[in-house]
UniProtKB/Swiss-Prot annotation:
Gene name for this UniProt entry: rep-1
InterPro entries, sorted: FAD/NAD-bd_sf, GDP_dissociation_inhibitor, Rab_escort, RabGDI
Chief place where the protein resides: cytoplasm
Family per similarity comment: Belongs to the Rab GDI family.
Name listed for the protein in its UniProt record: Rab proteins geranylgeranyltransferase component A 1
Gene3D superfamilies listed in its UniProt record: FAD/NAD(P)-binding domain, Guanine Nucleotide Dissociation Inhibitor, domain 1, Guanine Nucleotide Dissociation Inhibitor, domain 2
Organism: Caenorhabditis elegans
Effect of E107K: In ta208; embryonic lethality in some animals and reduces brood size. Some animals have abnormal germ-line development and gonad morphology
Length: 510
C-alpha cells in the first residue's frame, strides 16, 4: 500500500539522477524540507548502473499520457486560478539495441548460457553514463567536504593508453606514464622526449604558481591559438605533442593554449594525490554516486518514494504551487526536475547527441599480468569529433565477474568515423571477441526555462570525461535559487562539534 505523502514541503525533487541527487542533498543539508520522488523502482534515472539481467528496464521507462477522465479527476484537487501542467517524458536514452554475439562453431556453449548457469549475470554493473573522477577535482572535493565519501569506495584508474595508427601496424596502444618515476621507466619515449616532457611538467608547475614571467608572456601570445602551436613554440616535437595533447590534455578536447595548460595543470596536480594516476573510478559503477548523495539527503531529513510517478504539476500566477502523485497533492515552494520531465510545451535550448556502446568481453584490450582499469583517449583517431574515448573496467572495479570486462565507448556524433568503428578495430587488432553489445544514443538536453520561475531544471547527462561541470552547474543553480544558503558546506568533525558545545553552554549561562 502506498504511503501518504506530506501535504507540504519546501522542495519537491523529481528524478534520482546524479544532478537531482546532488541538489536534493544540498537542499536537505541547508535545512529545507525535501520530498524526492521517482517513477522508477530504482535510483539513478538516466545516470543509473544496471545488471545485465536488469538492463531491459532502460527501455521500459515510458509513461502514458493522461486521458480526459484522469485530467477531470485531478482537476478536483485544484483551487481557484490553478491549472494542471502535464509532465514531459522526453527520450534521454533512445535507439537502444542489445545483442548477444555468437562466437562461431568452436564455441562449446554460448556465453549467455555459461553466465546464466554460473549465476553471473547479476555481477555486471553497466553504466549509462560512465565517467571518472579527478583526484583533486570538484567532485572529490564535494564528496569529502559533505562526507558523502563515507558511503562510497573508489579504485585508481591505473592505466592510461595512447593510441597510434599506421597503415602497416594498425592501431597500437601505448601505456602512458603519469608520475616522474613512470616517465623515466617508460619505453614509449626516447631520452630526449623524456627530458622535454619533464621540462614541460616543470614549466606547468611554475606557470600554475606564477613563477615564470617568460612562460606567462609566451602563453599570453598564444592563449587562443591551438595548444599544439604553443607546444611547438616550446620546442616540443610532434610525437611528444600528440602524447601530451591526447593524455595529459584528455581533460580538455580540442584545447587552446590556455585551456590546454589549465587541463595539464589539473592533471599533474592530481597525480600522486591517491596514487600514481590522477583518476578514480567508483566501485560498483558510476550509478553508485546518485545513491550516495540520496543517502546524505535522507540523513538530513529528505523523504524518499520510489515507484511513485508524478501525474502532473500545478501552476498558478507563473509559479508551480504543487505536484500531484497517485492522486495525492503535495504543495511546494520549489520544484527540481530532471530534463526528462520538462513539459513538452517547453523547447530545449540545445541538444547534443552522444553515441554510446557497451561491450562485454572475456579478454582485455591490452593484456597485463594484473587486471587494469583502463582509460583510452581516441581523439587522435577521430580528430573531427569533440569527444571519443574508451573506458575498460572489470572485476577489480566490481563491475563484472572475474575474467570478464566491460568496454565503454563514448563519442559525439561527428566526423566520418564512428567510435564504434574504432573500438572494433582495436578489438580486431588485439584479438578480443565481444560476446555482448548494447548501443544507444543519449540526448543531452539543456533548457533555459521550464515554464515557471520556481522550477530548477537539473543539468543533463553529458559527454564530459569527469564530473566537474555537473558539480559546478549544480552549485550555480543552488546558489542562484537559494542565495542565502550554503551549497553542501564542509561537515564539522566530531571534535569541533564537541568543542563548540561547552562554549554554547557558557554563553547561555551568561
Amino acid at each position: 500500500m502506498d504511503e501518504k505523502l506530506p501535504e507540504s514541503v519546501d522542495v519537491v525533487v523529481l528524478g534520482t539522477g546524479l544532478p537531482e541527487a546532488i541538489l536534493a542533498s544540498a537542499c536537505a543539508r541547508a535545512g529545507l524540507s525535501v520530498l524526492h520522488l521517482d517513477r522508477n523502482e530504482y535510483y539513478g534515472g538516466d545516470w543509473s548502473s544496471f545488471t545485465m539481467s536488469m538492463v531491459h528496464e532502460v527501455t521500459e521507462n515510458q509513461v502514458k499520457k493522461l486521458d480526459s477522465s484522469e485530467i477531470s479527476k485531478l482537476s478536483e484537487l485544484l483551487t481557484e486560478n490553478e491549472q494542471l501542467i502535464e509532465l514531459g517524458n522526453r527520450e534521454i536514452v533512445e535507439n537502444i539495441e542489445m545483442t548477444w554475439i555468437p562466437r562461431g562453431k568452436d564455441e562449446e556453449k554460448p556465453m549467455k548460457t555459461q553466465l546464466e548457469e554460473a549465476s553471473q549475470m547479476r555481477r555486471f554493473s553497466i553504466d549509462l553514463v560512465p565517467k571518472i573522477l579527478l583526484s583533486k577535482g570538484a567532485m572529490v572535493q564535494t564528496l569529502c567536504d559533505s562526507q558523502v565519501s563515507h558511503y562510497a569506495e573508489f579504485k585508481l584508474v591505473n592505466r592510461q593508453l595512447c593510441p597510434t595508427e599506421t597503415p602497416e601496424a594498425g592501431i597500437t596502444l601505448n601505456p602512458v606514464p603519469c608520475s616522474k618515476g613512470e616517465i623515466f621507466q617508460s619505453n614509449a619515449l626516447s631520452i630526449l622526449e623524456k627530458r622535454a616532457l619533464m621540462k614541460f611538467i616543470t614549466f606547468c608547475t611554475q606557470w600554475s604558481t606564477k613563477d615564470t614571467e617568460e612562460g606567462r608572456k609566451l602563453l599570453a601570445e598564444h592563449a587562443d591559438r591551438p595548444f599544439s602551436e604553443f607546444l611547438e613554440q616550446m620546442g616540443v616535437g610532434k610525437t611528444l605533442q600528440s602524447f601530451i595533447i591526447n593524455t595529459i590534455g584528455i581533460l580538455q578536447q580540442r584545447p587552446t593554449a590556455m585551456t590546454g595548460m589549465l587541463a595539464s595543470c589539473q592533471f599533474m596536480d592530481s597525480v600522486g594525490h591517491f596514487g600514481p594516476s590522477p583518476f578514480l573510478f567508483p566501485l560498483y559503477g558510476c550509478g553508485e554516486l546518485s545513491q550516495c548523495f540520496c543517502r546524505l539527503a535522507a540523513v538530513f531529513g529528505s523523504l524518499y518514494c520510489l515507484g511513485r510517478p508524478v501525474q502532473a504539476i500545478v501552476k498558478k500566477d507563473g509559479k508551480i504551487t504543487a505536484v500531484i502523485a497517485n492522486g495525492d497533492r503535495v504543495n511546494c515552494r520549489y520544484i527540481v526536475m530532471s530534463p526528462r520531465f520538462v513539459p513538452e510545451t517547453v523547447p530545449a535550448s540545445s541538444t547534443l547527441k552522444i553515441e554510446r556502446i557497451v561491450y562485454a568481453t572475456d579478454k582485455s584490450i591490452k593484456e597485463a599480468e594484473k587486471e587494469q582499469l583502463t582509460l583510452l583517449n581516441l581523439a587522435s583517431l577521430r580528430p573531427d569529433a569533440a569527444v571519443s574515448r574508451l573506458v575498460e573496467v572489470g572485476f577489480e572495479a566490481c563491475t563484472a565477474p572475474k575474467g570478464h570486462f566491460l568496454v565503454h565507448a563514448t563519442g559525439t556524433q561527428e566526423g566520418e568515423t564512428s567510435v564504434k568503428t574504432i573500438a572494433e578495430k582495436i578489438f580486431e587488432k588485439n584479438e578480443v571477441e565481444p560476446y555482448w553489445k548494447m548501443s544507444f544514443t543519449a540526448n543531452s538536453m539543456k533548457f533555459d526555462t521550464a515554464g515557471a520561475e520556481n522550477v530548477v531544471v537539473a543539468p543533463p547527462v553529458d559527454a564530459n570525461l569527469h564530473y566537474a561541470s555537473v558539480v559546478e552547474e549544480c552549485r550555480q543553480l543552488f546558489c542562484t535559487t537559494w542565495p542565502e544558503l550554503d551549497f553542501l558546506p564542509r561537515a564539522m568533525k566530531k571534535e569541533e562539534e564537541e568543542e563548540e558545545e561547552p562554549e554554547t553552554e557558557e554563553i547561555a549561562e551568561n
